[in-house]
Amino acid sequence: MVNIILLIVSALIGLILGYALISIRLKSAKEAAELTLLNAEQEAVDIRGKAEVDAEHIKKTAKRESKANRKELLLEAKEEARKYREEIEQEFKSERQELKQLETRLAERSLTLDRKDENLSSKEKVLDSKEQSLTDKSKHIDERQLQVEKLEEEKKAELEKVAAMTIAEAREVILMETENKLTHEIATRIRDAERDIKDRTVKTAKDLLAQAMQRLAGEYVTEQTITSVHLPDDNMKGRIIGREGRNIRTLESLTGIDVIIDDTPEVVILSGFDPIRREIARMTLESLIADGRIHPARIEELVEKNRLEMDNRIREYGEAAAYEIGAPNLHPDLIKIMGRLQFRTSFGQNVLRHSVEVGKLAGILAGELGENVALARRAGFLHDMGKAIDREVEGSHVEIGMEFARKYKEHPVVVNTIASHHGDVEPDSVIAVLVAAADALSSARPGARNESMENYIKRLRDLEEIATSFDGVQNSFALQAGREIRIMVQPEKISDDQVVILSHKVREKIEHNLDYPGNIKVTVIREMRAVDYAK
């Protein structure tokens, strides 16, 4: 910075000196001109007459020369000032370049110093770490030295004891001590390994179950025991009841469903614990309303027709569920059996949806463990199929399911899965265990089942089974939410007098075998029909 100031000052001084030099020269020229003028005037005085013209000429010449000299001097001064300015600028430029180079060198030197400082810091840290490590090693060596000294003292003491023993006795003592130490160490390691394996197994199982539950979004609606049928107007209620209640009695006796007609506008309630019978009654009632012809013969015709239609719908439900679960080549009879589960509930949970859910969960778990996914899904889907027919065949749903699985030549893993999913038989495969876990997941999750609903349905089912256990009974239907049991008998086996006796026997068996609130009305119906055709 000082050099720059000096350069600027030098330039200013040069300019001042140049201007002063030019002024001096101009002054000298002026003085010379004045002197010449004076001489001319003197000569003019002497030779006035002759010199007037010459004096004028000389005067003009002097003026021209003075102007010429002034211009020349100005040009020379400007040229010198220009040259001097260029020299100063050149020097200033070179000084500036030197300053830039100096700044660059200083910056590089600063970076170099910073790097060296960082290197020194890192080396200092490394040295501190090594020093700490050496200190720790020194402490460890001291501790080991103390242990060695202690062991030497113990060995000396042992040797003093062994000195009085034979070689065999000494060897036996040493082997026993070594065995005790190794046994303790091995036992500790085994316990640690078992604890670690158990923890990892539990964690893995929880992860698998959590993943399976997150990947399955099942839909579920709690099953009901009533169905509402909407009427076009309230006048239809009288036609449904019929003359002296013939129509409604015929519908109830053929379907086993309680038809409730109350003050609710334009609605008839169908109540019954068997979803298949309730659905047949709903289809029949809706067909009667749409057709307009409501009488006992038409009711019988539509009930029979809707029973056949229900068989087709059951097959369609089974096919849709088998397609959803991915169970190809399923026997047609098994498809129909699975379709019937759409109308079965377990603790209020739809059994067909439960079976599909178990199949999907078992497939997810099998995929995580590298097992056969398709077989796991099939086994999970079929595990509860015995519930579809356990009312018609003796035995638990597990035994019935095993029998039908063997009958239709299902895979042995599927048979064992059905047999073991409630713990009655030991599982023979990983898939059987996975299906049992999936079954527990599906049924035990909050909201899946309703204990009170299942108890209610079981009470109605037991009520019907008591009635049908007597010889000569054709059908029995629990009505009025279990407050009435209506029994249809075979007229060729049961006489009018035996009807009264049968009602008393049924009442006594109900009182001894069932727990129920209030009273249960037992109604036995014997109907004799004679049909002939005129030709």
UniProtKB/Swiss-Prot annotation:
Residues 118-141 are annotated as: Disordered. It is a single-pass membrane protein. Gene3D superfamilies: Hypothetical protein af1432, K Homology domain, type 1. Residues 351-444 form the HD domain. GO terms for cellular component: plasma membrane. NCBIfam families: HDIG, PRK00106.1, RNase_Y. Belongs to the RNase Y family. This is Ribonuclease Y. It comes from Streptococcus pyogenes serotype M18 (strain MGAS8232). The gene is rny.
